[in-house]
């Protein structure tokens, strides 16, 4: 199954790739040519692929996404809800890599 090519503006590319996820799990899968990014809830897989390829000048093999529901938390008797989040696990083609410790 191939993803269709999507044309997105330069500004939208920076909106889609919000931040890399720097965790122990993210660094472990980084050794296998995968990178994790926080993305907006409305971002699609083809948009994420186009944004990563455009910003980092790499070839993307696959994009997997996951949505996390925000937890309900109490603070001083007030009930609040954390925001829902979406992450994208981007698999890079052989020979390509992204150093997430440097800025774009």
From Swiss-Prot:
Biological classification of the source: Bacteria, Pseudomonadati, Pseudomonadota, Alphaproteobacteria, Rhodospirillales
Species of origin: Rhodospirillum rubrum (strain ATCC 11170 / ATH 1.1.1 / DSM 467 / LMG 4362 / NCIMB 8255 / S1)
UniProt entry keywords in alphabetical sequence: Ribonucleoprotein, Ribosomal protein, RNA-binding, rRNA-binding
Pfam families: Ribosomal_L23
UniProt-listed InterPro entries: Nucleotide-bd_a/b_plait_sf (IPR012677), Ribosomal_uL23-like (IPR013025), Ribosomal_uL23/eL15/eS24_sf (IPR012678), Ribosomal_uL23_CS (IPR001014)
Self-association and partners: Part of the 50S ribosomal subunit. Contacts protein L29, and trigger factor when it is bound to the ribosome.
UniProt name for this protein: Large ribosomal subunit protein uL23
Biological processes per GO annotation: translation
Physiological role: One of the early assembly proteins it binds 23S rRNA. One of the proteins that surrounds the polypeptide exit tunnel on the outside of the ribosome. Forms the main docking site for trigger factor binding to the ribosome.
Family listed: Belongs to the universal ribosomal protein uL23 family.
GO cellular component: ribonucleoprotein complex; ribosome
Molecular functions (GO terms): rRNA binding; structural constituent of ribosome
Domain of life: Bacteria
């Amino acid at each position: 199954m191939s993803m269709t090519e999507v044309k997105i503006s330069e500004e939208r590319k920076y909106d889609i790739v919000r931040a890399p996820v720097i965790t122990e799990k993210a660094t472990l899968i980084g050794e296998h040519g995968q990178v994790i990014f926080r993305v907006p809830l409305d971002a699609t897989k083809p948009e994420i692929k186009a944004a990563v390829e455009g910003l980092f000048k790499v070839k993307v093999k696959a994009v997997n996404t996951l949505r996390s529901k925000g937890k309900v938390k109490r603070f001083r008797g007030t009930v609040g809800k954390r925001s829902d989040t979406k992450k994208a696990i981007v698999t890079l083609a052989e020979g390509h890599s992204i150093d997430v410790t440097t800025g774009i």
